[in-house]
Amino acid sequence: MPITISSVLAKETLTEAEIKNGTALRLARCVRSAEGEFSEGPHSYYWDVLRFQAEEHPSPSKLTCLAFRGEGRLPTGIRKVSPTKLATHEVKIDSASWRVDEYSLLLSTNEHRMLVKCGKDSLIIGGGLQGAAIREYGEIISNASVDENYPAWLQKRREALSSKPAPSEGPLMSIVTPAYKTPPAFLKKMIDSILSQSYGNWELVIVNASPDDENMRRVFNEYADSRIKVIETPENLGITGNTNLGLAHCTGDYVSFYDHDDTVEPYALAEYVRRINDSDVKPGLLYCDEDNIDENDVPSLPLLKPDYNEDFLLSNDYILHWLTVRRDLLKMVELSGKDVEGAQDYDMTFKITELSQPVIHIPEVLYHWRIHSGSTAGDPAQKAYTQNAGTRAIKNHLARLGVEGDVVRGRAFFTYVTSFEAPSPLPAIDVFCDGDPNSATQETLNAYNAAAIADSAVGKRLALWITPGHRLKLNDLLTMVQHATRNGVFSVSPRVIRADGLFDYANSIVAPDGTVRKLLTLLPSQDGGYVGRSERPMDAVVGNPECCLVRMDVAADLGIEHGISDNKSMLDAFVTAWCAGKRNLYMPYATAHLSTPRTLLEDENRQRVDFDILSGLTGRAFDDPSSNPAFNPFDPYYKLAK
């Protein structure tokens, strides 16, 4: 539930005495601070305290706080805490106007009680109240990857999808699986999951690179289905070589890439074929959502993917397993070689998308990636070479496109940071700010403009929308320029970190009611959020109207150059550009910092995009493609929809 002044009062209304006295104190929430190494766990929390004061009440008293160290009845230390004023709000209580001053108090995790006083009002926070607030915070920020109810959620989806009849007609689906020293139990489960497919027009091509493994041979001998082809190779050719050998024996219209110890849902092929049959233009590539399973087939860690997202793909192979490609397209590209061993699916994804064929995402968990000793899923460090192969896959992709860029490995396993050359000379930047940019941002702009061309009408035209509270350094602005001047980009929004070290902006989505929802707000800036989403570039429907770099030449082409005057019109410009096939890029490699405090409460008056624009340009009910239908669209932390 969103934490607002209304929700705080709903939980604990003002008493008659408080209304009569015209003052009150309430604890709104707590959030983890950004202090310390994130991996070490919380070092401290911000406690959000509200001071209510009736309009006719005299000037407020000073708010004070004492924090008590130690868990016993007698404290081992006392510390005076300096409150930080965050915001002032105006509310109506019983038709009367009240002012609400919001303060944050920073307490370490070994301070288990605090006393807050303001005038005659006092608030004691400790024991049960403190623990309850911390638990509530944990529930608020939890995401799908740690949801203990995920197996039950998956079972409901299984029941819904199993009830759908499989297509009676459709393409021949080839499935290619390189197998090397596969544990027999997992090999059998892999084959059985294909035999259980509700869609029957398939062939399974297994390349056995362990022909002397008697346990594997015994498993193969159990099956007499003519749709299963076992191709034996006397030597292990590696993942790419074995896969390519299997491709040579595939005869289907589409080819799915399948690992030797994983499983798929019995309706996996049916869902793919359904989408293929329903498409006016046959898709070139299809992919689905997935999760992990342990050695006992217990599911966990759902990987719920967005629709095709060019910039997200440059940071990680999010398409990953059960990649399915139209076979005639495989004849148009060079098959993956040893240089991308372990990242061959990533390499193939790039090659197929370069052909500009339709890409279809099926937002259902159809694939299960097995975690066991020796698997990449269980320990990514066991196959570190695959991460270097991923770097080469991206570099080769950029080279084929004729794009100058550089790729380095990211902070997390199997993630990458792709950068591009800024244009030379640099384009000039017009600045739009409600007031004057702060001194740090102005210094950045002065340094940039000293190197930029004088005439902004030449080449790509850029405009920076920014508030006086946002500080932007030169390297961050240059990163934004690098990406804003790429083909197809309309806007670039950096991640924004608050004065207290928490996220203010780490991408946003449009909810079904048209409201714009900032994602991962108030998490510590070191927190990657759901599978590292705060750290990955993402093409989005909307950007951040408070801080973004916009291509004004693109705006002019779209006829919206002169219609951008405030945050609302900027949001509508984002949507118009996205509907026209342009990209609004969330760019976490650039960071803006807020210089002034902001509220820890949620906005009760969210801005909305113009649904007439969305429905008019998309012709369909809106579902944000940078998210996933499995997520709760009103939750900023990637929770499962119930």
Which stretches of residues belong to each language-model region?
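Acidic donor-binding segment of Leloir-type glycosyltransferases
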Residues: L195-E235, G435-N438, Q442-I453
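Short secondary-structure "cap/edge" segments that initiate or terminate local elements
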Residues: M1-Y46, R51, E55, S59, ...
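C-terminal, non-catalytic tails of nucleotide-sugar-dependent glycosyltransferases
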Residues: Q130-S168, Y385-P427, T515-A540, N544, ...
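A recurrent flexible, glycine/aromatic-enriched loop bordering the glycosyltransferase active site
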Residues: T240, A248, P299-D328, V340-E341, ...
